[in-house]
Structure formats: structure tokens, C-alpha cells
From Swiss-Prot:
Keywords: Amino-acid biosynthesis, ATP-binding, Cytoplasm, Kinase, Nucleotide-binding, Threonine biosynthesis, Transferase
Entry GO CC: cytoplasm
One function term, GO molecular function aspect: ATP binding
Alphabetical list of PROSITE patterns matching this protein: GHMP_KINASES_ATP
Protein species of origin: Campylobacter concisus (strain 13826)
Pathway this chain belongs to: Amino-acid biosynthesis; L-threonine biosynthesis; L-threonine from L-aspartate: step 4/5
Sites where the protein binds ATP: P84, F85, S86, R87, G88, L89, G90, S91, S92, S93, A94
UniProt protein name: Homoserine kinase
Superkingdom classification of source: Bacteria
Main subcellular location: cytoplasm
Any Pfam family the entry gives: GHMP_kinases_C
NCBIfam families (alphabetical): thrB
Amino acid sequence: MNILIPATSANLGPGFDALGLSLKLFNSVKIEPSKFSSVSINGEGSDSTNLKRNNIFLSIFNEIFLELTGKNENFRIVFENNIPFSRGLGSSSAVIVGAIASAYEMAGFKASKSVVLNKAIIYETHPDNISPAVHGGFISAVVKNGNVYANKINLSDDIKAVVVIPNKPMSTASSRQILPKNYTMKECVNNLSHAAFLTSCFYEKRYDLLRVASEDMMHEERRMSALKELFEVRKVAYENGALMSTLSGSGSSFLNIAYKDDAKNLQDALKSKFGDFRVEIFSFDNDGYEITQS
């Protein structure tokens, strides 16, 4: 079997730990029964012997396969990793979702996406990345009593993601340590109102209002202070056609949304200014992970 798992961008400004969306940038995993277990990694992480020895995908896959079948079996697993590590593009969620969905498939169970999502929350407690990795689209999600409740809005082909990917990683754990334990009433109300407004803008396709809707007062600027160039990324993006410019997850990548006809000009402007960073254009994914038989 083969599985494709999309990259994701979470928070989207004010939707801290609640909002996310899916990009057409995929990791793929091919799994087949084998006489002996083997692992091959291509792309991101291919030069890491530690990743092969301490592979989170394998750990989760084997745990769930054993839970479902009561036995261990040998598999040949080939990873094609395209999602950058520790750049705020959901590489960890792709691993978790991919491992769970693959384990159910190889064990002979046709798990619904709801089952996969609720299993994934055990390993990743924030639903804003795992939900779009499962369902695709723009997602608003909450967790209640261990269950994930997620609503999806399909994203239009009229808009594109222009993603700035710095060469400096930022781990979610260290990025969270920057944040305060308490927030003011003003900060909380700002993010509640803007997250609600942002969701309605995507639903109504009012992309012209995304810049207003995506204002955050809780986490972005605090996190961006670890990589000062990100403030300039946002400035250049808005000067060159971006509808919305937000930190992707905990960073260090920056998500810029533009009309498809403006995306190339925006990419060129960002590349010209930030030559050391990758700047890529992606379509939005509305499907989430997909399994096919090889």
C-alpha cells in the first residue's frame, strides 16, 4: 500500500491551537509485507541514522498493528519525505496520521477518518495540525473528552499558498516556552473575535478581508522575535499582493496567501529579498491523507 499525507499550516494567526489548513506538499510511505523488516528514507532525513533507529512512524505503526492483530509482522517501508522538519509545516502530524492510517490498512481494517483522527489526538494533543492532515481543507477543531470535533471548509483554486521556508528550524516545544502563561482580556478577545471572523471569511470566500481577520495578539510576534527576518517577510508580502501573511504553526515557515494570478509575483518578490530562504508556491489540499494499493 501507499499513503500520501499532506503538509499543514496551523494557527493561521488568531486561531491558536484551533485552526489549520492543508497544502499540496506530501510525504509518501510505501509499505509491503516482507520476510525481514527494512526501512528506507528518501528526501528529508535521508542522511539521519538516528531517524532510522528512532523512527516515530515505526513506533506508532507497530504499536497499533499489534493492538489490532495481536501479532508482530515484518514490513518493508519506504519513506519519501518532502515536508521540511521543524519548520511549522506539520511534519510531526504527517508522521502520526500516516502511521495510524497505515497500521489500520495493513491490519485489514478500513478505518474511517474520524477513527484515525481520534486515535491521532493521543499522540498529538493539538488538533489544528492533525485535523487538516486527516481531512484536508480549512479546519476549525476542538477536543472534548478525548474526542476531536472538526469542521471543514474546502479551499478554492482561486488562491495559492506562497510559503517562505527559512533555513533555521524552530521546535514547537522551544517556541511554546517563549509564550506567557497568562494573557490580558484584550488579547483573548482579539483572538476570539478574529478567529471567528477568519473562519467566516474562508467560508464566504471573502479573501479580501483575510488580512484584517488574521490579526493575532497572543503568539506570533513573540515567536517571530526568534527570527527577526520574519517581520520583514510579512512587510514584503503585504507590499506585493499577499491577502494574508502569518507564521505557519510555531515557525519558522511563513504562510502567505495570494490570488493565483498574484502568486508568482509574490514569490519573485520574496525570493529577491530573502535569497537564503526557500519560497515555494503550493495549491491547497482538500482531501487529507489518501491510501492507494500499489
